[in-house]
């Protein structure tokens, strides 16, 4: 008897199909996960490359850094300190903006069109900027004191000769926002205690002498300095300034306590070979400068250095014949000063010089303005027996506004020291790389490189 057997494979086929589908799904999931990982890697590398490109553009194209100066600082056999510059132009513009004097100055500009200011009473005496605001320039650099290297921002000043810092014992208002020297935290501190007072054009500070290790760049040496405990006589300049103390780079005869200036003391202790320091102020960066101690870095200038003998070991001053347009002063005393932002001249001389030059004195402001392309402005000449130094208008003019016509501040201001005494400040030192030589009692000049 034949048997009829039927086998139902439908469930097997269904299971097999399910298995196949499951396997395909798993494979698809694995492929998707792999693709996902690669996509994440793609995004990562894309962001990395884009970020690197963006950084390159920022660092090298849009806001390029001066890598040349870093190379010079790293390879020089001398000590080079980079410092920041706060100049009078910045302070004046801040005051002008605070008191909304822009329109006031704009009206004064109409002198060039009408010979009269349209609104002579737009300003008032309360809006004034003091002469110190115009004359002073501050070079801020860092140094440390103590074996624990307490950091301070210093002004490098060729017009004084002592080093001072605010003391932890100072309770006056100006010290509240400053870095204070604490002798208790330094194991190398030596007590002196002699009380002193120092007088500056901007006021006075007082304190006492101390001795500790001072570190400038990579040079450390024991040095006698002043701990300042009272800054009230130095206000508001001290509170408003971005500095803690001052490093004097003048002559010993200027110092209180007959202390050798820092650079001379470095040579006394065989830390440097020459008692020499130099200033280089780049023409293309008004807020940076470089102080070299112990020698001359020839990569900062071009041509030959020429030297002038000092006429007195008090300030860095020399005898020069001055030619300002049609005016001449023979054997004038010219003080080369890192703390002055302008060329200064006696008031009587300057009034004569400005006659007929279309230069306007702004009422209530110690500010002289003119058009930036004023063809009447002459090249200034400073002559010694063997050398001639010139200063073109581009160096003593600073653009402040543009009203369709460019308006510049004239960086030549009246300061009455003596009848024939002039100060060669920032404009002169920006054109001429300047050498201050204690050993030979000279100052040297060479054309500063406009760009390294």
UniProtKB/Swiss-Prot annotation:
Residues 1-123 form a propeptide. The active site is at 157, 337. Optimum pH is 4.5-5. It catalyses: Hydrolysis of the 33-Phe-|-Leu-34 bond in the alpha-chain of hemoglobin, leading to denaturation of molecule. Gene3D superfamilies: Acid Proteases (2.40.70.10). Residues 59-452 are lumenal. Signal peptide: none annotated. The chain crosses the membrane at residues 38-58. One of its GO terms (biological process) is acquisition of nutrients from host. Residues 139-446 form the Peptidase A1 domain. It holds the Pfam family Asp. Residues 1-37 are cytoplasmic. One of its GO terms (molecular function) is aspartic-type endopeptidase activity. Digestion of host Hb is an essential step which provides the parasite with amino acids for protein synthesis, and regulates osmolarity. Belongs to the peptidase A1 family. This is Plasmepsin I.
């Amino acid at each position: 008897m034949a048997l009829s057997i039927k086998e139902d494979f439908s469930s097997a086929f269904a299971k097999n199909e399910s298995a196949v589908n499951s396997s395909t799904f798993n494979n698809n999931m694995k492929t998707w996960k792999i693709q996902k990982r690669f996509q994440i890697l793609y995004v990562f590398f894309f962001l990395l490359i884009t970020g690197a490109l963006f950084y390159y553009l920022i660092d090298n194209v849009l806001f390029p850094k001066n890598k040349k100066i870093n190379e010079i600082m790293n390879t020089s056999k001398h000590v080079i300190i980079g410092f920041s510059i706060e100049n009078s132009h910045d302070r004046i513009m801040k005051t002008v903006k605070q008191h909304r004097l822009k329109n006031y100055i704009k009206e004064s500009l109409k002198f060039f069109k009408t010979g009269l200011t349209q609104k002579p009473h737009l300003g008032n005496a309360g809006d004034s900027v003091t002469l110190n605001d115009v004359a002073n320039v501050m070079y801020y650099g860092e140094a440390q004191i103590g074996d624990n290297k307490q950091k301070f921002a210093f002004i490098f000043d060729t017009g004084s000769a002592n080093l001072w810092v605010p003391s932890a014992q100072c309770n006056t208002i100006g010290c509240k926002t400053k870095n204070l020297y604490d002798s208790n935290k330094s194991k190398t501190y030596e007590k002196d205690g002699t009380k002193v007072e120092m007088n500056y054009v901007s006021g006075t500070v007082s304190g006492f002498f101390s001795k500790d290790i001072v570190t400038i760049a990579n040079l450390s040496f024991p040095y006698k300095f002043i701990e300042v405990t009272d800054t009230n006589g130095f206000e508001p300049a001290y509170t408003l300034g971005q500095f803690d103390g001052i490093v004097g780079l003048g002559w010993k005869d200027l110092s209180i306590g007959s202390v050798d200036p820092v650079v001379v003391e470095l040579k006394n202790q065989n830390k440097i070979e020459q008692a020499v320091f130099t200033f280089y102020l780049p023409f293309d960066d008004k807020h940076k400068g470089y102080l070299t101690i112990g020698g001359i870095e020839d990569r900062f200038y071009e041509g030959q250095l020429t030297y002038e003998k000092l006429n007195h070991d008090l300030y860095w001053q020399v005898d020069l014949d001055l030619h300002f347009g049609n005016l001449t002063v023979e054997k004038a005393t010219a003080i080369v000063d890192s703390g002055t932002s302008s060329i200064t001249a006696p008031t009587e001389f300057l009034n004569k010089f400005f006659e007929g030059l279309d230069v306007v004195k702004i009422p209530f402001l110690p500010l002289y303005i003119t058009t930036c392309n004023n063809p009447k402005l002459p090249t200034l000449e400073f002559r010694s027996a063997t050398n001639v130094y010139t200063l073109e208008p581009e160096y003593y003019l600073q653009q402040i506004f543009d009203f369709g016509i460019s308006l510049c501040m004239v960086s030549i201001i009246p300061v009455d020291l003596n009848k024939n005494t002039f100060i060669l400040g920032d404009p002169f030192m920006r054109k001429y790389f300047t050498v201050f030589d204690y050993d030979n009692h000279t100052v040297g000049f060479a054309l500063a490189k406009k760009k390294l």
